[in-house]
Every structure is written in structure tokens, then in C-alpha cells.
UniProtKB/Swiss-Prot annotation:
Gene designation per UniProt: KLF9
UniProt similarity note: Belongs to the Sp1 C2H2-type zinc-finger protein family.
Protein name per its UniProtKB record: Krueppel-like factor 9
Assigned GO CC terms: nucleus
Cellular compartment(s): Nucleus
Pfam families: zf-C2H2
Chain residue ranges for the region called Disordered: 24-51, 80-142
Renumbered zinc finger spans (C2H2-type): 143-167, 173-197, 203-225
Entry keyword set: Biological rhythms, DNA-binding, Metal-binding, Nucleus, Phosphoprotein, Repeat, Transcription, Transcription regulation, Zinc, Zinc-finger
Quaternary structure note: Interacts with ZZEF1.
Length: 244
């Protein structure tokens, strides 16, 4: 029983007791019941001291009044939330096929085919919120490779196109250096290759004067410095992107 319900119960008992004292008939009834009558001047000594009876009566009235006053300030209870009304964390973020997988068994879906926001959450998302949260991040990758047996999924369509060329063998980026016949499936691969012809080394170590053609080579070198911090590489990249 809650505290508020208990207060109601005690107040009701007090009021019932007061009512019983006022309703006891003057004639007949058990001697014990007669003692519950309201104090009157006719009360005899065998029924006890009238002053004590009156004090009892006043005490009951005071308690009942206090409890009723307390009920005025009873806190409003907020409605409890049932698990059935909870929304799935990954609601409207796409179906299970959006999750990166190596099996490739589930078909891909377009954004128009995503789960209806008004549909009920799955039992798995309610029982295991951590799994649902993981699915939310994975479902952000909606571009799945359509090649048979490949289950890779990408967040950008351009990344999917570049990956798909691995299956088709297409290399649309030829090197323009004289007498070089190499072709590449990705533009960044061509850019790195082209620096081998020009000798350009645009990635400079922030802790020494060495330069490198590739950013990964710079990172590998910079880690050898004891005072190196990854933020140094990020600052140097921003400086290259914004020379002014």
C-alpha cells in the first residue's frame, strides 16, 4: 500500500470511528458500544471520565482533518511508461539489410523502402537496446554492393562505385604522364601514383624537415618522434587545404 493510500485509509477509519460514536443508540446495545457515544453530561462514571472521552473525540477529528489537508498536497503521479509504448531506437533508420555484413544474404533496400515510422518496434530492440543502438550506426550505411557473394555496405554511393570496380576490373582513371600506360579504378590511387613521376612530396613532418608523397607514410614516420601527437598531422593537412 502506498503512503497516499495509507493516509486515505487512516482518515477513513477516523471518520468511521467518529460516525460510530455519534450513531450509537441511547437504549440497548453492548456496554462497549455505549462507551463510543459522544460525550454528554449524562455520561455516568461507569462509562469513564467524560473529559477523557471528549479528548479522544477531538484527537480523532484533528487526525482526520490533518490527513485530509495533506491530501491536498499529494504529488501528482506521472503515468508509467510501458515497454509496449517505447519507440525503437533504430526506427525509420532502415531495415536489417542496411547493416554491414560479409554474407550478403539479405537484399538491399532503397531509402523509400525503409521501415515505417509508425510501425511497432521489434522485440529485439526492446529487450536488447544495445543491439538496437549498434544497428542504428550500421544502418547509416545504405549502399550495398550488388555483386553476388559480396556483402559490403557503404555510407556513400561514390564509395560503392569505387569498390564495385574491384569486381568489374574497370579502371577509368589513366595516368597522363608520357609513356605511362597505367590505369586506376580510383582517382586517389591515380593521384598518389602521379606523384611518383613528379617527385612531389607535399606531406611534411611537423617535427622535422622530411617530406613524403603519401599521408600514411608521413604518419608512420611521425610516430617515431616521442613528442608526436595526432593533432599535429591534422593541422598540417588543414594548412595544405587552406594555404591562404
Amino acid at each position: 500500500m502506498s503512503a497516499a493510500a495509507y493516509m486515505d485509509f487512516v482518515a477513513a477509519q477516523c471518520l468511521v470511528s467518529i460516525s460510530n460514536r455519534a450513531a450509537v443508540p441511547e437504549h440497548g446495545g453492548a456496554p462497549d458500544a455505549e462507551r463510543l457515544r459522544l460525550p454528554e453530561r449524562e455520561v455516568t462514571k461507569e462509562h469513564g471520565d467524560p473529559g477523557d472521552t471528549w479528548k479522544d473525540y477531538c484527537t480523532l477529528v484533528t487526525i482526520a482533518k490533518s490527513l485530509l489537508d495533506l491530501n491536498k498536497y499529494r504529488p501528482i503521479q506521472t503515468p508509467s511508461v510501458c515497454s509496449d509504448s517505447l519507440e525503437s531506437p533504430d526506427e525509420d533508420m532502415g531495415s536489417d539489410s542496411d547493416v554491414t555484413t560479409e554474407s550478403g544474404s539479405s537484399p538491399s533496400h532503397s531509402p523509400e523502402e525503409r521501415q515505417d515510422p509508425g510501425s511497432a518496434p521489434s522485440p529485439l530492440s526492446l529487450l536488447h537496446p544495445g543491439v538496437a543502438a549498434k544497428g542504428k550506426h550500421a544502418s547509416e550505411k545504405r549502399h550495398k554492393c550488388p555483386y553476388s557473394g559480396c556483402g559490403k555496405v557503404y555510407g556513400k554511393s561514390s564509395h560503392l562505385k569505387a569498390h564495385y570496380r574491384v569486381h568489374t576490373g574497370e579502371r577509368p582513371f589513366p595516368c597522363t604522364w608520357p609513356d605511362c600506360l597505367k590505369k586506376f579504378s580510383r582517382s586517389d590511387e591515380l593521384t598518389r601514383h602521379y606523384r611518383t613521376h613528379t617527385g612531389e612530396k607535399q606531406f611534411r613532418c611537423p617535427l622535422c624537415e622530411k617530406r613524403f608523397m603519401r599521408s600514411d607514410h608521413l604518419t608512420k614516420h611521425a610516430r617515431r618522434h616521442t613528442e608526436f601527437h595526432p593533432s599535429m598531422i591534422k593541422r598540417s593537412k588543414k594548412a595544405l587545404a587552406n594555404p591562404l
